[in-house]
Structure formats: structure tokens, C-alpha cells
Swiss-Prot record:
This is Non-secreted LysM effector LysM15. Pfam families: LysM, Pect-lyase_RHGA_epim. The gene is LysM15. Keywords: Chitin-binding, Repeat, Virulence. Disruption phenotype: Leads to enhanced fungal virulence, with faster decaying on infected fruits. Activates expression of several core effector genes, such as PEX2_055830, PEX2_036960 and PEX2_108150, and a chitin-binding protein, PEX2_064520. Residues 1291-1303 have a biased composition (Low complexity). Residues 1291-1317 are annotated as: Disordered.
Length: 1410
């Protein structure tokens, strides 16, 4: 149709006067963090109905299964058609007023319980068509939507019930009148093909069984392996060429779904035709459909919620005529045939608000279900036609008041295209979350009319509407991939309606991204264009033939001009922060934008859109086998351990490339359930996988409940409609570990699957076990360690995922609050690409989301909520941090600030390319960023938060500086791609990597503890040898090493390893050996004199120089530093504490009047009997009183430190050797040097003509920068070697043939010694050779030649693990290969004889030997 006439005030919605609302936030992940306002932490009374909870506010009423929307106090039934028509005429006249009033005065979310009547029942609204409703019709009819109301108007009530007489009259009129669907004149499939690419419905993995194995059925796959089977189910091709509905696999199966706790005979699967629906477009099917929905005593009026009455209600193809609302009960899926969408046709006699409704008003403020608790609903694969309903009655296709775990998918809404129509597709006045995707709207006054706390919508198409979509309030909303064609107004953003039920909340935060608006008068209309009002972001969107791109309707001014065709990369209005402390109001300006990684995107309307993928419908499965797990032996009865049979079924199905159908049930698994790569799984009404049993009970030994693939798997995973849960106590349960990486974009994916910990029948975590009145932690209610772990080698596409630790009981009438303890929510370590669309994580102790060492991550609308019981106990209690990557320890929380000890909403640690679109928070701190880059946050909104964002080592972004009504909001928090946010003092290092621990047989909890980062200077990584501390003679440098945060990190590391790695070993050592040694060296190095506050090593270095401890002045011997350091060494298994130290400590105790242990301690490794050590030099010496290493070094031409290292169990200090002990003298060196004050390596190498790093090579105890050369003299002595130990590079002896070299490598190739045989396999790219003798040992050869043992063996592969016994006397071995000796491609052989070799530097011939 052509565009509507020029816009006037009448067809541009005006705005209601409202108080500034709570604004929501957007990131490249929309994050709504919602807090529980409890107790002394948040300054409100700690009672259930007193805080502002997003879900749990209930009526104290008795359960009921009321099946009908009609009033029990009905009027008499009409006896004639004419009488029925008159009743409907009057009813619809009232309907036009009442439905309009409902839109004008919508009910906002209510966070307190509503009052009851005197008899304890919920109040009942008056009946439609009564005199009460006719009062003031004339006045009410004059109200324009979104305009300010008078006090008299604001007091009107707009709820009603439908009497049975009215409903019956509507049925009679409907069946008496032709009701065929109208002619809409729109080719929806063509429009979708024009703008959106056709995508795979599913990806088929290769069938592993090439032939029957005798156990499983073999199905030959006609479709190519790893190929698409079908076009996207949302492409509406089914509307053009309909396949036979009999081909829908689900309808051909025996229905075995059951609910273990429901009454016997209860049906999960319901086909509406089996309940009397005809689907012929003539018979009124309203009653039959409602009977199909309500059958079995389900949770309806005055029930609140229930988990034991799930239902999947199936609609075969057809046209279902309805004359009053179809009521969707709690925990219900409405499923249309995906091959041929059924049509729900609203009759011309229709009475009600929504053709399908998710909630029923019983009064202006009371309904069947609390909207913020209205969980677990799905409607998909339908056409909804309201064109026949009265044009002025404001009838909608779906009245959708929902919360988490809900979705609308694959639907087409048809409305009148008359300019005067009031019809609408979706009406949503309130709620708390959900997901909507692949909806098409044709015609209507509003395609969609939205209001909700936080929501995600994707892939919406609007055609020929007056107003494509309007948002009248929210906290946070992400709209992605929206197409608007031929509408007067595209997106309308209004200020919320007024009235007695208004909270004053306006549109807080809204993102419109990857959108296309074509042929519209106004692309976007808003009156909230003002400082401290709505945060709005328009990103990567295109306008074509749009008169005005953005219109300020309050002022009647153009904010952003239209045009024939142009794109908007990033534009909006709101506060923008480019540093932690300052934000600036951007009043309709370009907003900084990220560079989207290719891996996260696909084709777009201008620049690439973020990738999306809809859940598979499996509409054309070909010869693929469908496996029903109950048919194959699984019970799903909530009692039987189904783990073994499910593991077998899933393994076989993956091998067959079959699709696994899990009928509804509760499937107990008592150990890990393995979902192999290649699995495609579909549940029914959220089939439950329930972890239970002793293997999940130990929080110190986490156990994965459902493992999706093995680490390193690449391929296909498709999971949908499952619920992962537990039966407590299960403190160690990791509900899902995701390991699979995609093989094609988005091939590893999960949709509409949720996590629930407690609060339901069968969980053993309900009111009777875990009532919130329990002030102490009930260990039986500690129920999970981690909900979802996306591991480092994986990628994931997740859509509509709700991870909920229950805060209330879903299966009791009053839905009492409970205390359930889950450690962590969602941990993302993936290196990408990973997408999180419409996800939520709530009520976990340490964090709701943590992004750790991750990259290439998109998070679109994440919502969180903290546990109600916090800050009692203080986080991380009752859990111990350190089991998983970068667990928060809350060590920086001041004990006087209780608010600090609350869970983090989101932490981004050591990550890059993280894009977040929107958030809303509530507590002292909620969002931490540490050592991360390319992180972009949009539309951040907080409530009750002191610090909006808390980057490490930076000033926080304060909510008080970004006030927006009663919220605080930031449109964009951005730094640029190369900026490091939250830069730590030290990035940190790992003592162990995961690869280095492979094959050690460590437990799943031990490895993460060992691989945690230590947040210290990298210098400390070398402190793994037992010592007495590190002295650097540089206080500034030591201050840096002794950072307090480093000590906390080391202490936490050692503590965690001790806890999680108890009774395990790494080789022959205890797991804490390296970490404990570093920590002990840190404590020694950083110990300060209690009086002078100088470092103790600085103090000791100024002590009087003496020959031995017994010669020390008493004040020095008995000083705090000297005695304490020696006591610390004695007390620690990680220290160097020798017999000499023992004698000194005994001397201290006898001289200084101290007491305490002095005995030697066991080393931190297993001591096994070994032969007496070999003295390489064959020279021993018996020590005499007064001997020092320096004295003996000069006598034997060795380095003083070499004496200590050759005798580590005897000598602990070169200045004080124990007498009468036989010690081994090391190999000598030709050139010695006695250190002088201020000497350094660089100077000595220059003065003595030595090559770079030579001194460290000859004296390997020196650290990487020779920084300990001076500081270690007291312990290691002062005599250095300036030539190799055991040999020199001269040309006068036999044994080593050489050319000059640098370190252990030679500079040029030489031929092997004449008349020698080169050992088998030894490289000829060698510049130093050694001819072995019968008495040689490998260690002697290495020491003489200056080559490391590793390089020696690599260059001479004939030397086995037992190197000494592999040596062959007379053979020549390479002891100095040239650089790149093993790079075959580098060398070009030009040999002219067996002795000629090539070299990159120079060819040389031996001129002698040493």
C-alpha cells in the first residue's frame, strides 16, 4: 500500500506527562542487573513483600484449576441469533472503551502483594457489557493514547470479565457469519527473501557408522554429510508451497511424555483436535482449545505457578475460529505445525483483549499469574488474524505478559490496513524478560505495543502499519534485525502512560541495531529527547525513502534528517563515558562504535549484522532417524537413574546422525551425562535433566552434570527445549560444561533451554527444606557449584537461556521465599566466536556472569539479579573461591561495608573483543573490568548502585554522577579497541599451564587451582628454588616485588591448591611445591624490621662481616630480622634449611633466650632412596673450621657458588661451612674473578671480551638480568668463573673440536674429528665435537662443553634416556650445533665429499682440539 498521508498530530502518538523513569542500559551485551533490596545491606526492611523484587510477589490464595475466562455469575444465555447479535453489539461498544483504557492506563509491574477481599479471595472485575462499564463512556472515549489525563479520567477502571452469556453469544454470531481470513495483499515470503538471507534449518553431521554394527539401525543418508537439510523454518516458505502436514515427525510418534508428580493419566501432549477443535474456519473452536489447554487440573486461576503440570498443546494445520480469548496456562508450549502454520482467526464477534492471552485480569491490579513470575511459555508456528474484529476495539493478536524462559517465534499477525483501525499484533504492558523472534506484522494501528523490564527482540518485520512498534516503558530493551516497510511511523518511543497504576517509569534504555526502515514518513518518533531522560542507541541501521529519520514529537522538530538512502553507524542520545570518572551528555550525536569482528557477523543491510540463527524446526528430515529416548529404554520418572541408558542412546544417535527426542519427564542422572559432538536434541515442554546423588555433593570436587562434547571437539551441537536441574544436596554440581567449537558459523548452539536450581517438586530444595527463615546456612541447600561453563576451546550460540537459582518455591500456593545457594552463574572462557542472546543469570553467590580470558564475545541483553540473602552470609560464603578461573575472593571488601560482600553481576577479566548491549544493576558494586581490551558497553542502567562500573586500579564510574530519574544510566561506556581497561599492577603469570599438567592424573578441581594466575611481578616466576629470600639492593625495585596484592594472590593460590589438590602429586612433588616456594621466598624477601620498617634483607646486609654465626655480635644475632627469618625457614617445607642453619638456630636460642623447634623438615617431594651422588670432578674435600666457599674456590679454581650447589644438603651459606664434612669440589674453570662492589654482568663481559650472557652461562645461578649478583654474595660467595667449568676453548688438547660461538651454539660448522665415527643420527650442522671415552659421563661432557643436556640429547638422538650407558667410546658427538641446525628447509647441501657441509655463517675446519 502507498505510504499514509503526511503525518499529523492525530497519527503521531503524543506523549504522556510522566516523572523521569528508571533508565535501562545497553552494552554490546544488554545487561539488566536487578538487585534484591534486602535487610541492612540496602536500607530496606528484609521481608518478602517489602522489597522490590523482579519476580516473587504473590497472593496468598488457594490453588485452583479454573478452565475458563468467563465469569461464573453469568447472564442468561441468548435464545436467538438476533438476541446474540444485540448482546455482542453492546459488549463490543464497551470493549472499545475498556481495551482503549487498558492501553491508555496499562498496569506496570507490581512488586508488592495485592489486597484480597474480606473473604480472602482475589477481587473480581465487573462483567463486560454491564451498566458499570458504560459509565462515562463518552468522556473516556475522548482520551487519546499517550496524552496526559485528568484526575477524573485517571481514576477509571478498565478491567472486566466476560460473562458466559456474552461468550455464548459471541460463539453463536461467529458460527452464523462467514469468517474466512481476509485478503492481505502482502507477499511475506517475497519480502523476507528480499531483505534476509535464507539460512539452514539444521546442519547434519556425518554418519559415523558406514554399515550396520548389528546393534543400531542403519539409515543411509541421502543428503550430503555436514550439509544443510532445509531452508530456515522462519522463511515462511511454508506459506507458499505447503508440504504435507503428515510429514511433521512429531505427529507420527507415540506420545510418551509424562510428568512424574502429576496425577495418574495426566497428559503432556495435547492435540486440540482430539478435544473437539475442527480447524475448519466455520466452527467456533474457542471452548475446545481452552479445554485442551486446561485439561488435567492445571494451574489456572488463583494457582500462581506450578512445575508439575506442563503441557505441549499442538495445533494441526487449519483455520481455528475463536470468539473469545485462548488462555495459555502456566508452563505451556503452543506448537503449530511448522510445515503449514495453523491460523487462529478472531471472529467478527470476538470479545476480549487478546486472541491468545498469557494472563487473565481478575481486577485492575490482580491477575491469574504475577506477571514478573510468569515463566516457561512458548508460542510458535502460527498465523494470527484479527482483521475481522471491530476496528475500534483495540483487539490484539497476543496479550503477552511474561517473564524469563518465554518466547514467541515464527508467527505472522494480520491486522486491518485501514487508516482508522485500532488493531494490534502483540500487546505487552508489563513483565520481566523474555525473547521474541521471527515475527511478521501486516497492517494495524500498532504492529507491536511493548512494555517490560528487560527484553530481547530479534528479526521482526513490520509491513503497512500505522505505527510499526511502540515502546511505552522499559528498563532495558535490545531490538535487533528489525525491518519496517511502508509504515507511517517506525519505532515510537513514548514517555509512559499515567494513571493510578503508573510507576512513572518511562522508556529507560533502548537499542535499535541492524535495522532497516523503508518508505516511512518517520523512521523513529520520540518525545524523550532530553538530558536525563531515555538512553537511546541507533547502530548499524539503514533508512531508505524516509522523510524524517528521527522526530522529536514533543517539540515537532527533526532530530535526524531523512533521505533516499543512508546508513547510521552509531547515533543516539544519553550520557557517554570515555573515562571512569567523567560522562558527557550526547544530545543526538554520533556515538563511538566498535569494529565488529568478522567471526561474529554475517551479511547486513549496509555493514555486516551480528550473526543470528533460529532454532531448528526439523521440517525436512529426509531419511534421518528420530530416536525417542523413552522408546529406547529411558524412564524419565524422576526416580530411575537414566544416566547410563541416556549415555548409550546419545552415543548411538550421534554415530547414526540421528535426532534425539526427549519426551517430557524428569531424567535422573547420578553421574556425568555425555552429549557427543554431532548430537541434535529436542525436548518437550522443557524436559528435565536432573543431577542427583553423592557424586555431585562435594563442592570441593565439582562434578559436571551434562558435558556437551569433549575438550577439543569441533562440529555440530543443536539442543533445544531442555531444563537442567538438580535434586539436592548437590554442592559440587556443574550443571552444564560446553566444550564443542563450531565447524561452521553457529553450528554449536542451544535454544530455549534453561537452568533451575531448587524451588520445584522433586528438587528437595523447597520451602520445607530451605525456608528463608533459616538464618544459618543449611548445607543441604547448597545446591550447585556452577550453572554453565563455556570452556576455552569452545564456541557457542546461545539464545533465550535462563539460569535461575530459585528464590521462591514454584510449587506451593504462597510461593514462599527460600534460600538456595549456588556458587556461580555463567562462566565464559571461550576464545570465540560466542553469542549470548536474551540470556539471564540470577541469585548466584560469587557472580552471575564472568568473562575470563575470553575474546570475540557478543552479549545481547543479559539480565541478572543478586541473591536475596546477601550480604548474610558474606560472599563468597558458603563457597570457597579458587575452583574456577579467576574466582572473585572479595579480599578488597572492607568488613565495615556489608554491601561489598555481594555477588558480582558481571566480571570481565583478561578478555578482549567483548561487546555488551545494555544493563541494569542494584547494589554497591556490580560490574568489574580487569586487564581487558576492546570492550564496549552500551546503555548501562543501574538502580540502587553506588559504583556503576568498577575498573581495577581506576576510579569507579559513580551512579550519583549519572542520575536519570530514579535510575542512573549511561548510553555508552567506551575506551577504544586498544585501550586496556582495569589495568592491574601486574598482568600476572601462571605457575602451571593446563598443557604442562596433562598426564598427571589430577582431579578436575585440582587443575583449575594449579592454573590460576598469580598476580605478581614476572620476576617471582623464577623463585621456585628453596632459598633465603631475594636481595636486590634496590628498595624501589623490592617495593614493586613486594606488592601487597601479590602476597594476597600467592596466599590464595597456595591455599586453594592445598584444598583442591590434597593427596595428589605432580611427579614426585606435592602440588603446592612451586607456588609454596615462591610464596615463602616472597615472605622472606618482603619481611620488614618491626622497628625501622626497612626490609630485613637490607638490614642484614649491613651486619658485621664475620666468618660464622658464632662470631656475630649478640645484638645482630638476636635481632628481630635475623631470628625471624631463620625461624620462618625452619617452619616452612619450602625453604632452604640445612644442618648448618639448625646449628645457628640452636645457637640463637641458647644465646638470645628464645625457644622453639629447630629440627630439619621433610622436603615438599617424595624422597626415594638414591645412589650416593656422583662427584663429577672425583675431587672431595673435608671441611675445616673457618672454611668459606670463597676460600676454597680460589684454592680449587672453581666458582664459590658452585661449591654450594654441588653440596646442597650440606652447605646452606657460603660464609659459614659446617666443619668435618666431606664435600664434592665442582669442576674447575681456567679464569676466575672476585666480585667487587658495583660490578655487573654487562661491565665484566665488556672488560673481559666475553659474549652476551656468557657470565650467566658460566655461573647459571645468576638470574636473567644478573640482578642478584651483588645481593647474593653473602650466601653464594664472591668468586665467579669467566670461562666454562671443566674445559676451556683452546686448541692444545684432545677431546673437543671447536669454532668460536655464542653460548651453547657455535658460529660455524666444522667437520668431525679425523678418524672418528659420528654417532648414529647426530647432526652434522655442528661447530663443536666431542670424542667420547670409556670413562665419560654425559654430565661431564655437558659441563666441559657448555651445552645444556636438552640440546646435547637433541643434537645426538642416539643418546637414550639412560644417557651414560648410551655413550659409545670413540664416537664423535655434537656439543655445539650451529643456530637453526634442525631447520631442514634452511640448509642447502653443497657437499662435495663426506666431510663438506654447508653453513649459514661460515665454513670452517677444526684447527685443533681442547
Amino acid at each position: 500500500m502507498p505510504p499514509h498521508p503526511n503525518t499529523t498530530k492525530e497519527n503521531i502518538p503524543s506523549l504522556v506527562k510522566a516523572t523521569p523513569g528508571a533508565q535501562s542500559l545497553r552494552w554490546m551485551l544488554l545487561f539488566a542487573f536487578l538487585c534484591s533490596l534486602v535487610g541492612n545491606a540496602y536500607g530496606t526492611h528484609h521481608q518478602h513483600h517489602g522489597h522490590q523484587h523482579l519476580h516473587h510477589q504473590v497472593r496468598d490464595v488457594k490453588a485452583s484449576a479454573t478452565p475458563t475466562v468467563t465469569s461464573s455469575s453469568s447472564s442468561s444465555l441468548p435464545s436467538t441469533l438476533e438476541e446474540a447479535k444485540e448482546i455482542i453489539k453492546n459488549a463490543q461498544a464497551s470493549l472499545a472503551v475498556m481495551n482503549k483504557g487498558r492501553l491508555a492506563y496499562p498496569q506496570w509491574n507490581q512488586y508488592i502483594a495485592q489486597p484480597k477481599s474480606k473473604n480472602g479471595t482475589s477481587p473480581v472485575a465487573p462483567a463486560l457489557g454491564t451498566e458499570h462499564l458504560a459509565t462515562n463512556h463518552a468522556m473516556i472515549a475522548k482520551i487519546a493514547l499517550n496524552e496526559s489525563k485528568t484526575e477524573d479520567q485517571s481514576s477509571q477502571k478498565f478491567s472486566y470479565t466476560i460473562p458466559s452469556g456474552v461468550a455464548h453469544a459471541a460463539k453463536l454470531v461467529a458460527e452464523a457469519s462467514p469468517q474466512s481470513p481476509g485478503s492481505h495483499g502482502v507477499d511475506i515470503a517475497a519480502i523476507r527473501r528480499k531483505y534476509r538471507p535464507q539460512r539452514n534449518d539444521t546442519n547434519r553431521p556425518a554418519q559415523k557408522y558406514a554399515q550396520s554394527n548389528g546393534l543400531d539401525g542403519y539409515v543411509h543418508a541421502q543428503a550430503p554429510m555436514n550439509s544443510a537439510l532445509d531452508s530456515d523454518s522462519g522463511d515462511d516458505e511454508s506459506q507458499l508451497t505447503k508440504r504435507s502436514s503428515a510429514d511433521f515427525w512429531l505427529t507420527t510418534m507415540t506420545q510418551r511424555g509424562s510428568s512424574p508428580y502429576a496425577p495418574e493419566g495426566y497428559k503432556v501432549w495435547r492435540n486440540v483436535k482430539e478435544y473437539g477443535a475442527k480447524g475448519d474456519g466455520v466452527t467456533d473452536d474457542t471452548a475446545a482449545i481452552n479445554l485442551a489447554v486446561s485439561d488435567g487440573g492445571r494451574c489456572g486461576a488463583d494457582c500462581g505457578s506450578s512445575t508439575i503440570y506442563p503441557a505441549q498443546v499442538y495445533f494441526p494445520p487449519g483455520t481455528y475460529l475463536v470468539s473469545s480469548p485462548i488462555i495459555q496456562y502456566f508452563n505451556t508450549e503452543f506448537l503449530g505445525n511448522p510445515l503449514d502454520y495453523p491460523t487462529i482467526l478472531a471472529a467478527s464477534s470476538f470479545v476480549g483483549l487478546g486472541v491468545i492471552t498469557s494472563d487473565v485480569y481478575t481486577g485492575d491490579t490482580t491477575e491469574w499469574y504475577i506477571n514478573t513470575n510468569n515463566f516457561l511459555r512458548s508460542v510458535r508456528n502460527f498465523n494470527v488474524d484479527v482483521t475481522r474484529t471491530p476496528q475500534d476495539a483495540y483487539v490484539c493478536g497476543i496479550h503477552w505478559q511474561v517473564a524469563q524462559g518465554t518466547s514467541l517465534e515464527n508467527m505472522v499477525f494480520y491486522m486491518s490496513q485501514d487508516a482508522a483501525t485500532t488493531q494490534q499484533g502483540v500487546y505487552m504492558e508489563n513483565g520481566s524478560g523474555g525473547f521474541i523472534t521471527n515475527l511478521t506484522f501486516v497492517g494495524g494501528n500498532f504492529g507491536a505495543y511493548f512494555g517490560n523490564q528487560q527484553f530481547t527482540t530479534s528479526e521482526l518485520t513490520f509491513i503497512n502499519a500505522k505505527n510499526a512498534l511502540q515502546v511505552h516503558w522499559d528498563w532495558a530493551w535490545t531490538m535487533q534485525d528489525v525491518i519496517i516497510e511502508n509504515c507511517v511511523n517506525g519505532l515510537v518511543i513514548v514517555g509512559g502512560a499515567g494513571g493510578s497504576m503508573s510507576t512513572g517509569q518511562s522508556v529507560g534504555s533502548l537499542i535499535l541495531m541492524d535495522a532497516l526502515i523503508v518508505n516511512a514518513t518517520n523512521g523513529i518518533v520520540t518525545s524523550l529527547f532530553a538530558e536525563n531522560s531515555t538512553s537511546f542507541l541507533l547502530q548499524n541501521s539503514v533508512f531508505r525513502d524516509v522523510t524524517t529519520a528521527v522526530l522529536d514529537s514533543a517539540q515537532g522538530t527533526e532530530i535526524l534528517a531523512g533521505g533516499a538512502a543512508f546508513g547510521v553507524e552509531s547515533w543516539g542520545f544519553g550520557r557517554v563515558a570515555t573515562s571512569s570518572t567523567n560522562s558527557t551528555f550526547y544530545n543526538g550525536q554520533d556515538i563511538p562504535v566498535m569494529e565488529r569482528p568478522v567471526s561474529l557477523t554475517y551479511m547486513g543491510y549496509d555493514k555486516p549484522n551480528f550473526f543470528q540463527r533460529r532454532r531448528p524446526a526439523y521440517t525436512n528430515i529426509g531419511n534421518t532417524q528420530i530416536i525417542d529416548v523413552k522408546e529406547w529404554g529411558a524412564a524419565g520418572d524422576g526416580t530411575t537413574n537414566d544416566g547410563p541408558i541416556l549415555n548409550s542412546i546419545l552415543d548411538r544417535a550421534a554415530n547414526l546422525s540421528a535426532i534425539v527426542f526427549i519426551p517430557h519427564g524428569i531424567y535422573i542422572v547420578e553421574d556425568t551425562l555425555h552429549i557427543p559432538v554431532g548430537s541434535r536434541i529436542i525436548g518437550q515442554a522443557w524436559s528435565q535433566i536432573m543431577m542427583k546423588g553423592s557424586k555431585f555433593e562435594n563442592q570441593l570436587k565439582p562434578r559436571v552434570g551434562v558435558q556437551v562434547g569433549q575438550v577439543g571437539d569441533v562440529g555440530i551441537i543443536e539442543i533445544q527445549s531442555l531444563l537442567f536441574t538438580v535434586s539436592g544436596p548437590t554442592a559440587g554440581a556443574v550443571l552444564v560444561e560446553w566444550n564443542v567449537h563450531q565447524s561452521t558459523q553457529g553450528s554449536a548452539a542451544m535454544w530455549d533451554s534453561h537452568f533451575r536450581v531448587g524451588g520445584a517438586k522433586g528438587s528437595s530444595l523447597q520451602t520445607s527444606q530451605c525456608d528463608k527463615s533459616d538464618t544459618a546456612v543449611n548445607t543441604a541447600c547448597v545446591a550447585a557449584s556452577l550453572l554453565l561453563h563455556i570452556t576455552s576451546q569452545s564456541s557457542a550460540y546461545l539464545e533465550n537461556i535462563w539460569a535461575w537459582t530459585a528464590d521462591h518455591d514454584l510449587d506451593t500456593t504462597a510461593q514462599e521465599q527460600i534460600n538456595i545457594y549456588s556458587g556461580r552463574g555463567i562462566l565464559v572462557e571461550s576464545q570465540g566466536p560466542t553469542w549470548l542472546y536474551g540470556t539471564s543469570s540470577e541469585h548466584n553467590v560469587l557472580y552471575q556472569y564472568q568473562v575470563s580470558n575470553a575474546k570475540d564475545l557478543y552479549m545481547g541483553m543479559i539480565q541478572t539479579e543478586s541473591p536475596y540473602f546477601q550480604p548474610t552470609p558474606h560472599a563468597p560464603q558458603p563457597f570457597k573461591a579458587g575452583l574456577f578461573s579467576n574466582d572473585p575472593v572479595f579480599a578488597d571488601c572492607d568488613s565495615s561495608s556489608a554491601n561489598c560482600f555481594a555477588s558480582w553481576a558481571l566480571r570481565i577479566i583478561d578478555s578482549s573483543s567483548v561487546y555488551i548491549m545494555g544493563t541494569e544493576d542494584c547494589q554497591q558494586r556490580a560490574f568489574e573490568i580487569s586487564q581487558s581490551t576492546d570492550t564496549w558497553i552500551y546503555n548501562l542502567v543501574t538502580k540502587g548502585i553506588v559504583e556503576m562500573i568498577s575498573p581495577v586500579n581506576e576510579d569507579p564510574t559513580l551512579a550519583a554522577n549519572n542520575v536519570n530519574g530514579f535510575m542512573s544510566s549511561i548510553l555508552a561506556w567506551v575506551r577504544g579497541s586498544n585501550s586496556t581497561i582495569g589495568e592491574r599492577t601486574f598482568p600476572g603469570f601462571q605457575i602451571y599451564t593446563a598443557d604442562s599438567l596433562e598426564g598427571q592424573g589430577l582431579t578436575e578441581s585440582c587443575t583449575p587451582a594449579l592454573t590460576q594466575k598469580v598476580l605478581c611481578s614476572p620476576f617471582l616466576k623464577t623463585w621456585t628454588s628453596p632459598g633465603i629470600g631475594q636481595y636486590y639492593k634496590n628498595t624501589t625495585f623490592t617495593d614493586m616485588l613486594c606488592d601487597a596484592g601479590c602476597g594476597e594472590s600467592l596466599g590464595s593460590y597456595v591455599d586453594n591448591v592445598e584444598t583442591y589438590c590434597a593427596n595428589q602429586t605432580i611427579g614426585s612433588s606435592i602440588p603446592t611445591r612451586n607456588g609454596g616456594t615462591i610464596y615463602h621466598n616472597y615472605n622472606l624477601t618482603c619481611l620488614e624490621d618491626k622497628d625501622t620498617k626497612e626490609y630485613c634483607l637490607d638490614t642484614i646486609m649491613d651486619f658485621t662481616t664475620v666468618e660464622s654465626a658464632k662470631d656475630m655480635p649478640t645484638n645482630e644475632l638476636c635481632s628481630y630480622c635475623y631470628t625471624t627469618m631463620l625461624e620462618m625457614r625452619q617452619a616452612s617445607i619450602y625453604s632452604s634449611y640445612t644442618e648448618s642453619d639448625k646449628e645457628t638456630l640452636e645457637l640463637i636460642q641458647s644465646t638470645c633466650g628464645l625457644t622453639g623447634p629447630t629440627e630439619l623438615h621433610d622436603p615438599p617431594y617424595t624422597v626415594t632412596p638414591t645412589p650416593d651422588p656422583v662427584c663429577v670432578s672425583n675431587t672431595t674435600y673435608t671441611t675445616q673450621p673457618g672454611d668459606t666457599c670463597d676460600k676454597l674456590a680460589k684454592q680449587y679454581s672453581v666458582a664459590s657458588a658452585a661449591i654450594l650447589y654441588a653440596n646442597p644438603t650440606i652447605i646452606g651459606n657460603c660464609s659459614d661451612l659446617p666443619a668435618s664434612r666431606d664435600i664434592c669440589m665442582p669442576l674447575g674453570c681456567d679464569t676466575q674473578y672476585t666480585l667487587q662492589d658495583d660490578d655487573n654482568c654487562w661491565q665484566l663481559q665488556r672488560d673481559y671480551g666475553l659474549g652476551p650472557d656468557s657470565i650467566r652461562q658460566y655461573n647459571p645461578w645468576l638470574d636473567s638480568d644478573c640482578l642478584n649478583m651483588q645481593g647474593a654474595r653473602e650466601i653464594l660467595g664472591s668468586v665467579l668463573c669467566l670461562s666454562p667449568q671443566g674445559a676451556t676453548h683452546n686448541t692444545t688438547g684432545d677431546g673437543i673440536t671447536t669454532t668460536p660461538g655464542n653460548g651453547e651454539y657455535a658460529q660455524g660448522v666444522v667437520s668431525p674429528p679425523e678418524n672418528s665415527t659420528v654417532a648414529p643420527g647426530t647432526t652434522t650442522k655442528c661447530g663443536r665435537w666431542y670424542s667420547a671415552t670409556a670413562d665419560d659421563l654425559c654430565v661431564q661432557i655437558c659441563l666441559k662443553s657448555g651445552v645444556s643436556a636438552k640440546l646435547f640429547k637433541a643434537a645426538n638422538p642416539s643418546l637414550a634416556a639412560d644417557c651414560d650407558n648410551s655413550l659409545i667410546a670413540g664416537d664423535a658427538y655434537c656439543v655445539g650445533p650451529v643456530p637453526r641446525w634442525n631447520d631442514t628447509a634452511y640448509w642447502i647441501e653443497t657437499a662435495t665429499s663426506s666431510k663438506a657441509v654447508s653453513t649459514p655463517l661460515a665454513s670452517a675446519k677444526a684447527t685443533g682440539s681442547v
